[in-house]
Every structure is written in C-alpha cells, then in structure tokens.
Amino acid sequence: YLNGSFSHDKNSFNGLELIKNKNVDLVIHINSLSMNKLELDTKLTNIVIGHPNSKFSSIPDIFIPIGIPGIDYKGIMFRTDNVVSVNLKKIRDIKLPTLKYIFDGLI
C-alpha cells in the first residue's frame, strides 16, 4: 500500500527472478507434497523444509523432512481459487513433524 493505493512490483515479489538476479543470499524452500526434483542454486544458501523423499539437483545446506498433510497428520487443503476446501485425515504414524511445528520452533 503506497500513496493511498495498492502497489505491486512484479520483480520484487517474483522468487525465481530474485534468485536469478542474485538479489538474495538465502533461499528457504517449503514443499510438503511434491517429490519432484528441486533445482537448487549452489551459489546460495539453501534450506529445504519438505517431503521426506525430496530429490535435489545438489545437496541443500539444511534439509528438514516434514510430514505430508492428509497422510501423516490431519489438516485442511484449500484450492488456490478458494472454491473448495477438503478436510484431510491422518492415515499413518510416521513421526515426522508438521510444518507448523517447525515454524513454531523457529519463532
């Protein structure tokens, strides 16, 4: 919010552009759902909080595996257009922390 109206700079809020242009020195990747290979920039410090079977283009500086929503713990999944929400139930007990647990510990 700037000068009485909303302001949005697409370059300031585009994570890929910030990384590509070397405007950051630390990248925190959060992904509890996908096992797709995550491309890491080895010139930056990379912290990954994610799926226990995550694959990486290079070894991250820090990797914290977390549980998968709807499998390892209950939760709510929202569609990005906010049309539907789905209650998720825990179906196994793998003893991995939730993302919330990790964030609460950091705060």
Predicted regions and their residues:
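Non-catalytic alpha/beta scaffold blocks inside enzyme catalytic domains
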Residues: 1-107
